[in-house]
């Protein structure tokens, strides 16, 4: 099967979040299964700086962005049997960053038009065109309304994945003529209109053959007003084409037996190295070295979405327990201040690292006993899967991908891979932590069983990609 991904970012070239991870991993896994896979993304200045000497110039052409006649350079690089095509235009993409400019609408309108015209020019007409988030959300609409005259495009099936429903691409309707070069009929009849704006994401939901998001629970949640960010009505209307597929993690890179960032390696069969990592981290961060004290790890952006309001409300309470806690991350200033204050007040219990450090992050996953992640909402979440891979049991709020990936401890049969609570409040976070501490302190065999079960879970992309493969096959 020929599959083309179009996205605004992709690891290792340009990455700001989870979308970049998916584009770096899913095409590679599909290629391993024998599919012919290509990725189209912008050629940013940071791509040129890091990979410019490896990337070949393929061709160039011009495209019309409304009245503008714009240059489209095409560059190419093959990696892991996936061909990456880069759209090169320094005016649009040499900004020192991926997103956040006043003209993002124009930048990504240009990118979508260039990507669609590129397919014919490189003679790669995919069976499935898989687009991601609002930056590429007009492609399914353009495929059917603007480029339908290209006969080769008529059998292409479009899949749209929502990674972040908060950013929907809402613009003035004049953009249809001014940038995309199409009439306003579909806006005037209400198809593309939402809240009196042109809504790119709504267009993708209506015009795609399938819509996916990054976990089954989140797919259900975005059909509700609480999580749908204003698009819940459209999600309910189009529920028949909506499904959720949990993202994977790179299990080759994230491997406690080989991770280069760890001073000691370990496996689910031999956790001796995990204890040594704990002692090493305690020494490194100036905490008292004690292999028996439960160590709670947090690696996260410090925001309300990640549940830091309820963590902050209970932090004094938590630090009365016989625990140690290590926090790594940056975010809202008041949370940074709160954790720094409590770290100075309880220097033997709390280490607050208000920065981001990949090496330290891996060491926290490997050293901690409990990984705290009580997100208010979480479309998928990768940290809880990484924690389980390293034998750190997640303590999570049952929402989105957290609900789908963490099995709550069952005290009757010992099953589970972590601890969870349903009602989003500091009280239930604290009660769940007390349960986890009780199991850790009083039932060591039950704890070891939970660690074994967590480390046995397969969250690899090779497994996650099977669900995408089945989805694509349903469209043929």
From Swiss-Prot:
Residues that bind ADP-alpha-D-glucose: 15
Keywords annotated in UniProt: Glycogen biosynthesis, Glycosyltransferase, Transferase
Function: Synthesizes alpha-1,4-glucan chains using ADP-glucose.
Protein's organism: Streptococcus agalactiae serotype V (strain ATCC BAA-611 / 2603 V/R)
EC id: 2.4.1.21
GO MF terms, alphabetically ordered: alpha-1,4-glucan glucosyltransferase (ADP-glucose donor) activity; alpha-1,4-glucan glucosyltransferase (UDP-glucose donor) activity
Name of the protein in its database record: Glycogen synthase
First-tier enzyme category under EC: transferase
Cross-referenced HAMAP family: Glycogen_synth (MF_00484)
GO annotation (BP), single: glycogen biosynthetic process
The keyword Iron-sulfur belongs to this UniProt entry's keyword annotation: no
Catalytic activity: [(1->4)-alpha-D-glucosyl](n) + ADP-alpha-D-glucose = [(1->4)-alpha-D-glucosyl](n+1) + ADP + H(+)
NCBIfam families: glgA, PRK00654.1-1
Disulfide bonding pattern of the chain: none
Family: Belongs to the glycosyltransferase 1 family. Bacterial/plant glycogen synthase subfamily.
Known pathway: Glycan biosynthesis; glycogen biosynthesis
InterPro entries per record: Glyco_trans_1, GS/SS, Starch_synth_cat_dom
């Amino acid at each position: 099967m020929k599959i083309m991904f179009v996205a605004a970012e992709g690891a290792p070239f340009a990455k700001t979040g989870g979308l970049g991870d998916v584009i770096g991993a899913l095409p590679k896994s599909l290629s391993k299964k024998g599919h012919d896979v290509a990725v189209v993304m912008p050629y940013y200045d940071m791509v040129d700086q890091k990979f410019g000497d490896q990337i070949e110039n393929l061709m160039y052409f011009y495209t019309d962005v409304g009245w503008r006649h714009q240059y489209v350079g095409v560059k190419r690089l093959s990696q892991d049997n996936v061909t990456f095509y880069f759209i090169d235009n320094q005016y649009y993409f040499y900004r020192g960053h991926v997103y956040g400019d006043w003209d993002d609408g124009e930048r990504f309108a240009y990118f979508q038009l260039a990507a669609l015209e590129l397919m014919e020019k490189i003679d790669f007409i995919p069976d499935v065109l898989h687009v991601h988030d609002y930056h590429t959300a007009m492609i399914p609409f353009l495929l059917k309304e603007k480029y339908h005259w290209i006969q080769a495009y008529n059998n292409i099936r479009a899949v749209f994945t929502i990674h972040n429903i908060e950013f929907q691409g809402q613009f003035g309707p004049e953009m249809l003529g001014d940038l995309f070069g199409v009439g306003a009929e579909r806006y005037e009849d209400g198809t593309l209109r939402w809240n009196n704006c042109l809504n790119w994401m709504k267009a993708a939901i209506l015009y795609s053959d399938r819509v996916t998001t990054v976990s089954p629970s989140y797919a259900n949640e975005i059909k509700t007003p609480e999580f749908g960010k204003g698009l819940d009505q459209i999600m309910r209307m189009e529920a028949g084409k909506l499904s959720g597929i949990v993202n994977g993690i790179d299990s080759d890179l994230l491997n406690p037996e080989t991770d280069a960032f760890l001073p000691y390696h370990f496996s689910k069969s031999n956790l001796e190295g995990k204890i040594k990592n704990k002692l090493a981290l305690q020494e490194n961060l100036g905490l008292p070295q004690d292999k028996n004290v439960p160590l709670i790890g947090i690696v996260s952006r410090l925001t309300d979405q990640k549940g830091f309001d309820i963590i902050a409300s209970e932090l004094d309470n938590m630090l009365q327990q016989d625990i140690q806690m290590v926090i790594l991350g940056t975010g809202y200033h008041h949370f940074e201040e709160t954790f720094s204050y409590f770290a100075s007040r309880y220097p033997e219990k709390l280490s607050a690292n208000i920065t981001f450090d990949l090496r330290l992050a891996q060491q926290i996953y490997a050293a901690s006993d409990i990984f705290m992640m009580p997100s208010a909402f979480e479309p998928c979440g990768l940290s809880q899967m990484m924690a389980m891979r390293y034998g750190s049991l997640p303590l999570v709020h049952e929402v989105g991908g957290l609900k789908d990936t963490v099995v709550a401890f069952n005290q009757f049969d010992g099953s589970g891979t972590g601890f969870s609570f349903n009602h989003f409040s500091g009280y239930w976070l604290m009660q769940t932590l007390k349960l986890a501490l009780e199991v850790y302190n009083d039932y060591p065999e039950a704890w070891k069983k939970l660690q074994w079960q967590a480390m046995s879970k397969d969250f690899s992309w090779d497994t996650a990609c099977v669900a995408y493969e089945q989805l694509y096959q349903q469209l043929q």
